[in-house]
């Protein structure tokens, strides 16, 4: 009897310990969310260790309350009359503390920058060197008459300042249950939000040197990407900086956003090569009254349309290499579509994406006649928080927010998104190489 009592007491103690441990573990799980994945494509962990590769780290410690930082100094500049001064000041704001650390926010000692989560997922998802995502193919002649290489592509990474990061954090407050409606409820991003994106070209170095003169003296990054945009396979390649986009939430603009673009020109020969990105132009509307159908898909020179009232293009031909721009001379960068515009694509951002971001990108709309009423739906001056489609939530000109939410929905169906965890340095010894893509061992 005594022995049974001792065994019973022992069993109760063990059971109590198990229940206590389970309760503590459960509370820890509920109080602390798993971080968002950093990336979705990379060489194997063994190669990362062997070569001491610095991995991309998603900046995701989003502000919990709206930052009280003052508006940047460039808000004092007239963005129409002094457009170039404005763009140079924006560029400096984006570059401070970033250019000397390869744009790794965790190393920036000047100001905080954040990334959009859920860009890691899918075939086009983030790679692990710099967080670049696969964006768009580059057609023959798109970068100039001498460009004959046909399989290159655009790879990009974007950054948001503290006010932009605050909005991202509100939408993604629950990592497993993002709330798109908060975008609309909050009126989108607050004034003072600054977003910028660096775009790189995937093309072999010797080809770039021969075919794209303004990319000589280029700035190159390592990336887990490829030189054939149509291929899903990846390998370690060199990609070259070619473009920078900026978006500034500024209520002086009719829509609420000012959009700018920069193009790389190695002949500028700045000691900090990032500053070889020269202002291409600025826009604050889409000139909806202008329906003339012209484009310049293979640029021998930059066509500047004097009739546009809401786009300004850099007229300095010594500074700006020939550029195709957008439809009828609207602002668009070298890696963008010559039949669209910066404003056009971003104004269609919504979740779910019921309409394509360009009438060219869907069989139902690709036959619209340029300049027709159907076509011009994509070239209106929409308020940044208005709905492009009924039944969708506007994401305030943020294509990345719309894409991130859609990626999360797609993942919920497949539950396939834990690949990045094998790159947790502390866990290397516990995991085998689990890369789902081509590996370099």
Which role does the model predict for each range below?
Residues 1-13:
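N-terminal Sec-pathway targeting helices
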Residues 13-31:
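Bacterial Sec-dependent signal peptides at the C-terminal "C-region" and cleavage site
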Residues 4, 17, 396:
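Functionally constrained cores in energy, signaling, and assembly domains
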Residues 28-341, 349-353, 357-441:
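Conserved small-residue
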């Amino acid at each position: 009897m005594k022995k049974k009592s001792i065994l019973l007491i022992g069993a109760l103690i063990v059971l109590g310990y198990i229940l206590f441990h389970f309760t503590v573990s459960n509370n820890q799980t509920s109080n602390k969310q798993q971080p968002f994945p950093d990336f979705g494509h990379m060489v194997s962990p063994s190669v990362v260790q062997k070569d001491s590769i610095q991995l991309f780290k998603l900046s995701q410690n989003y502000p919990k309350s709206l930052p009280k930082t003052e508006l940047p100094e460039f808000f004092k500049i007239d963005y129409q009359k002094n457009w170039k001064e404005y763009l140079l000041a924006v560029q400096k704001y984006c570059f401070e503390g970033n250019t000397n650390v390869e744009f790794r926010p965790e190393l920036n000692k000047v100001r905080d920058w954040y990334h959009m989560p859920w860009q890691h997922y899918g075939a086009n998802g983030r790679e692990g060197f710099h967080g670049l995502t696969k964006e768009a193919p580059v057609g023959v002649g798109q970068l100039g008459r001498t460009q004959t290489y046909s399989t290159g592509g655009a790879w990009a990474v974007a950054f948001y300042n503290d006010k932009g990061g605050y909005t991202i954090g509100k939408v993604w407050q629950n990592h497993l249950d993002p709330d798109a409606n908060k975008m609309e409820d909050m009126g989108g991003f607050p004034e003072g939000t600054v977003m910028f994106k660096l775009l790189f070209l995937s093309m072999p170095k010797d080809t770039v040197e021969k075919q794209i003169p303004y990319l000589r003296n280029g700035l190159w990054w390592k990336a887990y990407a490829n030189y054939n945009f149509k291929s899903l396979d990846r390998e370690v390649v060199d990609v070259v900086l070619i473009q920078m986009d900026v978006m500034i939430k500024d209520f002086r603009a009719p829509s609420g956003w000012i959009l700018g673009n920069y193009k790389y020109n190695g002949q500028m020969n700045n000691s900090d090569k990032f500053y070889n990105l020269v202002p291409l132009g600025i826009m604050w509307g889409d000139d909806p009254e202008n329906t003339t159908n012209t484009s310049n898909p293979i640029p021998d020179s930059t066509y500047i349309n004097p009739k546009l009232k809401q786009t300004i293009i850099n007229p300095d031909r010594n500074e700006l290499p020939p550029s195709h721009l957008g439809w009828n001379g609207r602002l668009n960068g070298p890696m963008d579509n010559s039949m669209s515009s910066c404003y056009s694509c971003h104004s269609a951002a919504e979740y779910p994406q019921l309409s394509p971001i360009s009438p060219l990108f869907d069989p139902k709309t690709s036959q619209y006649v340029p300049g027709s009423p159907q076509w011009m739906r994509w070239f209106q001056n929409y308020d940044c928080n208005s709905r492009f489609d009924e039944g969708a939530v506007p994401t305030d000109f943020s294509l990345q927010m719309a894409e991130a939410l859609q990626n999360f929905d797609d993942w919920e169906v497949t539950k396939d998104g834990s690949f990045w965890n094998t790159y947790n340095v502390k866990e290397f010894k516990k995991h085998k190489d689990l890369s789902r893509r081509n590996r370099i061992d």
